[in-house]
């Protein structure tokens, strides 16, 4: 998630079994062995076309050189958010961890202590061009998983998380000024 190949990506594993399974998934479940005729192949499982182009690979490799700086910037952003919202009702989902690469910066907000609902806050921030998001909607609320028989479970912790969470902007090119704008907007609500 921290670097791009435009589309697609890479998986690493030290498991031979997992490696073989991933090869099947990426190429329509097809296998070609040396003992087969030149045109033959076998579809051993349902798979997908998860092969990326050489150009996408080149882009990904060039991004690897920037990965350390991307992660360092994300950590700076996380520290700034942590400091800004310390002693407020906006709580980071995780406390600062120097080992985290901060794909997301998720906060929990006790909306019972605000004069605004989660939906109103979300819309208001979006109207101010602040790209907040909600990560993630619980899977037992999704139609696909409901069709598989999930959804009736009692999940009070997940439900509470979903009621309180949203993600603040977190990406390496987020400027200090843009982050300050996000923080000031949230303090408008907190002081409101």
Locate predicted features.
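Exposed boundary/loop context
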Residues: 1-2, 40
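Glycine-rich phosphate-binding loop of ATP-grasp-fold ATP-dependent ligases
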Residues: 2, 6-11
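PLP-dependent aminotransferase class I/II
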Residues: 14-192
